[in-house]
């Protein structure tokens, strides 16, 4: 059963979350409830806004089920009701809704979610959240040659080659600094692991994982990295960050 959360619009964000809904829970501490709502909104907005995608515009209703560890077990996106679609800016043209819902569902599975207050959960430990999303990612901002799009494409490249097939047992962020020559051969790599701001409780420093990621990074051919470029000295340097969690295992 989905509970009702008050609408909220981020007018300055590329993606705005109109609100979330879940089951009524009058016994829940109001401050804890509001913190969860705010963190849930922040997580979804960040995830959608940083997707490596072309132009995407529209209003989508996303249904998410989280288990007792705040891992997603269900992600379903559909066209939002008319009352949400009518609030999109008048000067934008919605893009293909099927492509948009596929993107939202894919990002839903990649998102790191906040801890759900115990009193909000169902008897089986889960919680269902319904989130109307306004998505405005214009073509100019999403062009492949923009700095932000290159950054997201590079993040996904390193995810595919370093972390995707790793069955991690904790939640965190991995930062990566690299240096390569003009041919893309890696000459230096530094991977660091640290807590995700929404799930500091679930982070464990894993020296073996850190060493493995460093080793994998050193073996990469970065000539295939999106946006790969060298400076006047023939060196390529860069930085990226990746979120990781058990439910992201073997997901794109």
Regions of interest found by a model, annotated:
Residues 21-252:
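Charge-biased low-complexity segments
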């Amino acid at each position: 059963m989905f509970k009702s959360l008050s609408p909220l619009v981020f007018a300055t964000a590329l993606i705005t979350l109109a609100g979330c809904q879940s089951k009524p829970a009058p016994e829940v501490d109001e401050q804890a409830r509001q913190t969860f709502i705010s963190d849930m909104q922040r997580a979804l907005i960040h995830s959608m806004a940083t997707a490596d995608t072309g132009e995407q515009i529209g209003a989508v209703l996303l249904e998410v089920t989280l288990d007792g560890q705040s891992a997603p077990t269900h992600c379903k996106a559909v066209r939002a009701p008319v009352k949400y679609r009518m609030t999109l800016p008048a000067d934008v043209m919605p893009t293909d809704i099927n492509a948009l819902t596929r993107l939202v569902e894919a990002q839903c599975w990649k998102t790191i979610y906040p801890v759900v207050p115990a009193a909000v959960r169902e008897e089986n430990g889960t919680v269902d959240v319904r989130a109307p999303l306004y998505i405005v990612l214009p073509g100019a901002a999403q062009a492949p040659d923009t700095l932000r799009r290159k950054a997201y494409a590079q993040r996904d490249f390193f995810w595919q080659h370093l972390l995707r097939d790793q069955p991690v047992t904790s939640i965190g962020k991995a930062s990566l600094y690299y240096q390569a020559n003009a041919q893309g051969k890696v000459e230096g790599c530094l991977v660091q692991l640290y807590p995700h701001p929404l799930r500091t409780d679930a982070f464990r420093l894993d020296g073996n994982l850190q060493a493995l990621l460093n080793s994998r990074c050193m073996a990469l051919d970065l000539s295939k990295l999106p946006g790969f470029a060298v400076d006047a000295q023939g060196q390529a340097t860069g930085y990226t960050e990746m979120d990781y969690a058990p439910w992201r295992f073997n997901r794109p």
